[in-house]
C-alpha cells in the first residue's frame, strides 16, 4: 500500500501518521512538501517549489487563492517528474491547494484534512469587538473559502480534528467529513510527579506558586492581552506567585498589527499597563520536554481562545494533569467540562479568570481532581493510538470505494 501525503510543511499534521503506517503497517509513505527532499526514517520527502504567488498588485481578497493555485501547480509539476510514484491514496491538508490538480495525475482516491472553514459572523472574525475587522477583511474571509470548497467537492472523503471545526463546514458537505483528532502521545504527555522544578534553565523554588500560559504566538486571538490583565491581578494579590509564559513574541493570526501599530502584540500589551515584570518569566519557544515540565510544575494553567482552532497545548496540558482555567468558548467547551476537567470563565472577564486561578492557588487540594480527570479524559478520548487506528480505518475504507471518476 502506498500513501502520498501532501502538505507545505513537514511533519505538520501528517508526519506522525506516515511514521506509524510505515513502521507498524509496512505501508510505503511518501510526503510532498516544500522542505528539502530526502528521507526521514522510512518516509520519502519529495520537494515542491512554488515559482510564483500573490503580489502587492493582486486583489487583496484573492491572494490566498492565488497562492493556493501556485501551490497546486508546483505539486503537480514535482510529482509529474516522478512517474515512479503511483500512490493508492492521496492525503492532503485542505486550503493550501496542494491536492487540487492531482486528479489529473492519479487515478486514486483523495482524502483532505479540513482544519477551518471561515465565517464572518459568530466566529473568530467578529468575536472581539475591541479588535474590529474591516469590511475588506470580511470580504476576504469569504474568498478564503474558495479552495476549501474546491477540496470539499473534489475529495472522496475528509476529516476534521474536532466537532467544533467540523460544525463550521457547509452542511451539505459534512456527511463526507469525519471527526478524527490528530492524537496526543500520552506516553510522552503525562503527569510526572517529582519532576525537577526547572524550565528552560530557570529554577523555580519550592515555595513559589506557578501560573502558566503557553501559546504559539502572543496575540489577541489567543487572548494574550486578557491573560496579562488576569496575571497582573494574581501577582498583586499574592507575593508567592511566578508567571511562566511559553511562546514566541509574534502574531500568527489576525490583524493585531493594524490595530496596535506594533509588530509585537506583546510589547503593545505591556505598554498599556504597569506590569511588575520581575514576576514574569517569558521563556520563548521551548521544546516539548520542557513543556512537559512546565505543565507538571504548574499550579494552574490559563488558556484563552476565540472561537477558532483549538491549540494542541491545552490538550497537552490536560494530558499532563494540569489544573486549567480557560475561556468558555465553543472549541474549549468540547474538551473541558466546567467543574469536572477544568474551570471555564467568560473570555472577556480577566477578573473572573484571576479569581478562578486564585481559588486554585488558595485551595489546591480542592481542585486537584480537575487535573486528574483532565488527564484521564485525554487518555480516554484523544490518545494517539486509537486516533491513528481511526485514520487507518478511514484510509482503508476509502481505498476500496467505488469512486466517481468524473469528480
Please name every model-derived segment.
Residues 1-46, 159, 407:
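N-terminal subdomain of nucleotide-sugar transferases
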Residues 200-222, 228-233, 243-244:
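Conserved donor-binding/catalytic core segment of Leloir-type glycosyltransferases
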Residues 306:
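Aromatic "clamp/platform" in nucleotide-sugar-dependent glycosyltransferases that forms part
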Residues 323-326:
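Short hydrophobic beta-strand element within catalytic cores of glycosyltransferases
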Residues 338-339, 343-350, 359-364:
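Conserved acidic donor-binding segment of nucleotide-sugar-dependent glycosyltransferases
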Residues 352, 359, 366-381, 387-393, ...:
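A short, well-ordered alpha-helix in the C-terminal region of glycosyltransferases
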Amino acid at each position: 500500500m502506498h500513501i502520498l501525503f501532501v502538505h507545505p510543511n513537514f511533519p505538520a499534521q501528517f508526519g506522525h501518521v506516515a511514521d506509524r503506517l510505515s513502521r507498524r503497517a509496512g505501508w510505503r509513505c511518501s510526503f510532498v512538501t516544500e522542505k528539502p527532499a530526502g528521507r526521514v526514517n522510512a518516509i520519502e520527502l519529495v520537494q515542491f517549489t512554488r515559482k510564483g504567488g500573490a503580489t502587492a498588485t493582486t486583489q487583496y481578497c484573492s491572494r490566498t487563492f492565488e497562492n493556493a493555485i501556485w501551490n497546486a501547480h508546483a505539486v503537480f509539476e514535482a510529482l509529474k517528474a516522478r512517474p515512479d510514484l503511483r500512490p493508492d491514496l492521496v492525503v492532503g491538508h485542505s486550503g493550501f491547494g496542494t491536492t487540487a490538480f492531482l486528479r489529473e495525475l492519479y487515478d486514486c482516491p483523495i482524502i483532505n484534512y479540513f482544519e477551518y472553514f471561515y465565517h464572518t459572523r459568530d466566529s473568530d472574525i467578529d468575536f472581539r469587538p475591541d479588535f474590529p475587522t474591516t469590511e475588506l477583511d470580511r470580504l476576504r474571509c469569504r474568498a478564503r473559502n474558495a479552495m476549501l470548497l474546491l477540496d470539499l467537492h473534489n475529495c472522496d472523503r475528509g476529516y476534521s480534528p474536532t466537532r467544533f471545526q467540523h460544525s463550521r463546514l457547509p452542511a451539505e458537505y459534512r456527511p463526507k467529513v469525519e471527526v478524527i483528532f490528530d492524537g496526543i502521545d500520552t506516553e510522552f504527555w503525562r503527569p510526572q510527579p517529582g519532576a525537577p522544578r526547572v524550565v528552560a534553565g530557570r529554577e523555580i523554588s519550592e515555595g513559589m506558586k506557578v501560573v502558566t500560559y503557553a501559546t504559539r504566538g502572543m496575540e489577541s486571538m489567543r487572548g494574550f492581552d486578557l491573560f496579562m490583565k488576569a496575571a497582573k491581578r494574581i501577582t498583586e494579590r499574592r507575593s508567592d506567585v511566578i508567571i511562566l509564559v511559553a511562546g514566541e513574541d509574534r502574531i500568527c493570526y489576525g490583524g493585531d498589527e493594524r490595530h496596535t501599530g506594533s509588530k509585537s502584540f506583546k510589547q503593545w500589551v505591556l505598554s498599556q499597563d504597569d506590569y511588575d515584570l520581575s514576576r514574569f518569566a517569558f521563556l520563548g519557544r521551548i521544546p516539548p520536554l520542557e513543556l512537559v515540565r512546565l505543565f507538571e510544575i504548574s499550579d494552574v494553567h490559563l488558556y484563552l481562545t476565540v472561537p477558532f482552532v483549538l491549540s494542541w497545548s491545552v490538550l497537552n496540558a490536560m494530558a499532563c494533569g494540569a489544573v486549567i482555567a480557560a475561556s468558555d468558548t465553543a472549541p474549549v467547551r468540547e474538551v473541558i467540562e466546567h467543574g469536572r476537567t477544568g474551570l471555564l470563565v467568560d473570555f472577556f472577564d480577566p477578573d473572573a479568570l484571576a479569581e478562578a486561578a486564585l481559588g486554585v492557588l488558595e485551595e489546591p487540594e480542592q481542585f486537584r481532581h480537575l487535573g486528574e480527570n483532565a488527564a484521564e479524559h485525554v487518555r480516554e478520548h484523544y490518545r494517539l493510538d486509537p486516533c491513528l487506528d481511526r485514520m487507518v480505518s478511514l484510509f482503508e475504507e476509502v481505498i476500496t470505494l467505488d469512486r466517481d471518476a468524473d469528480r
